[in-house]
Amino acid sequence: EPSSRLRGRSRWWCYERGFMADLVTITIDGKQTTAEKGTLVIEAARKIGVEIPAFCYYEGYSLQAACRMCLVEVEKMPKLQPGCTLPVAEGMVVLTDSPKVTEARKTTLEFLLTNHPLDCPICDKGGECELQDMVFRYGAGESRFTEIKHHGDEKQWSPMVYYDPARCILCYRCIRVCDEGLGVGALGLTYRGVHAEITPSHGDHLECDECGMCIDICPVGALTSGSYRYKSRPWEMNHAGTVCTHCSNGCKTTLAIRNGEILRANNRDQSGINGEFLCAKGRFGYDFVHSEERLQSPLVRKDGQLVETSWSEALTLVARKFAEVKQRGGKFGVIGSTRTTNEENYYLQKFARQGLGTGNIDHHRSGDVASFLNALAGKREALASVEDLYTTKAALVIGTELSQQHPLLAFQLRANHRHHGSSTYAVTRGPVREDDYAARSLRAGEGEQIEALEQLRGDLSKHASVVILFGDSVKGADVAKLVAF
C-alpha cells in the first residue's frame, strides 16, 4: 500500500520477484498467520505483534545480519537462523523466544558488552537505548572476559555530530542511511576486528548536510548531538508534535521541551508524511525560538520612540487604529507568511475577511504558483502527492536542486529507485544528487530547461505517467510549456 514511510526490504524483495500475490502459511510462537512469499521472518512477526529484537536491521535499508540479535529457532533447521534475512516459506514453524534463542541472545549481548563502556548514567542515550533495553530483558549481567576493555577516544566530527567508538556496536545503520537513504556517503568503516570503527569519508571531519539522521538512527549512544549533549534525560522532557515550516513539504517534527525550552527535535513516533526523516533545518533549526534578538513583548511608538508595552495596551491601540481607518473608508492589505502553519494562516484570512472586511490577502512566494494554476486550468493532469513519489514508475526533476530545496522529496525519490527501480530524469543547471541514480541527466541554464526537455521526449514517452517536480527557475510561460509537454 502507498505510504510516505519507507517500506521494508522484504516488500522490495517480493515486489522485484513478482511474489506479491503468493501467500504462505507460517506459525510464529504458536500463532498461525499468512504472509506474502518472500517476506522476511522479522517483518512477518511484527505484523502479528511479535517483536524480534535486532540492532542492525532497519526497515527500508539493505540487510546486514551483523548483530545476530534476531536469531530464531526454525523447526527442522539444525541451527538458529537470522530472522532479518530469512524469508518465510510454506509450513514454516518459528520460535522467537525459546530457551535456546534466549540463551543465544544473552551470549550475543555478552559479546557486545565486551568492550562497551558501562557508562549509562552519563550517556545521552540512557533511557532510550536499544542495547540497554535488551540487556535488561535478556540478562548478560556477568562477563567471562577479564581482559582490559579496548577503548577509543570520543571524536567530534562536526559541531553537530560526536562519535564515541567505544559505544559503537557496528550495526552499520548510520552508514546505510547516509549512503542509501540520502545519497551522501559521508561515512564508512575502517580497520578490522576489535579496532573497527565508523569513520567519515573525508578523514576526521564530516562533509555533508549534517541532517542528523545518523544520530537518530543509532541504537546506542555512539553518535550524539552537539546541540543536545548532557542537557537532559528523555523522561525529564515533555514532547509536542508540530509541523516544520522551513519549506513547503510540511514534515512532522516532535519537539522535546524542558522548563519551557526546546532541547531537541526529531520525529520519534515516525508519523506524518516524512516518517522518520528530518533534514538539517527540521532537526536543528529551532534555535531562533530562543534568540535573544527576538521580541519578548509588544512595542508601540511614543514620542518617536518604540517602547515596550503590555499586550492589552498594544491590542487596544491596534484595534482603535483599525477602526479609524475603516471609518474613513480606507482599505486594508494583509500579508501572511509561508513559515506559519495552515491553521494560523486560516485564522489570519478569517480575521482579514470578517474583522477587517477585506479580501486583499497575500504572501511572499518564490515559485510561480499563479502561472502553474493557470496552466492547469481545464487540464486533466493531477497534482502529485508525496506518496506518489514513492510509487511512481518515472519522475522528472527540472530546475531544482531537490536535496536542498525539498529534502523529503529527494529522500522519497531515492527510496523509490532503491526499492522499486523507478526511472528518474533530471534537467538542472548544475550537478545534483539525483545524477547518481538518474536514467538520464541534462545540464541547461535558466530559460533553456524547457527546450532541453525535447531530448528526453522519447524516454519519457515510454512511461504511462510521470511525476514532475520543477523548481523556482521555471517561471511564467515556461510553466505553461512544461504542463503542455
Annotate the PLM regions.
Residues 12-13:
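Tryptophan (W) side chains
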Residues 21-29:
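Eukaryote-biased recognition of intrinsically disordered, low-complexity regulatory segments
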Residues 31-39:
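Short, contiguous acidic and Ser/Thr-rich linear segments
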Residues 32, 55-60, 164-165, 197-206, ...:
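Conserved short loop/turn motifs at secondary-structure junctions
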Residues 41-75:
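A basic, amphipathic helix-loop patch mediating RNA/tRNA/ribosome contacts
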Residues 68-245, 249-251, 258-262:
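Fe-S ferredoxin-like electron-transfer domains
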Residues 113, 117, 229-485:
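Catalytic alpha/large subunits of respiratory electron-transfer oxidoreductases
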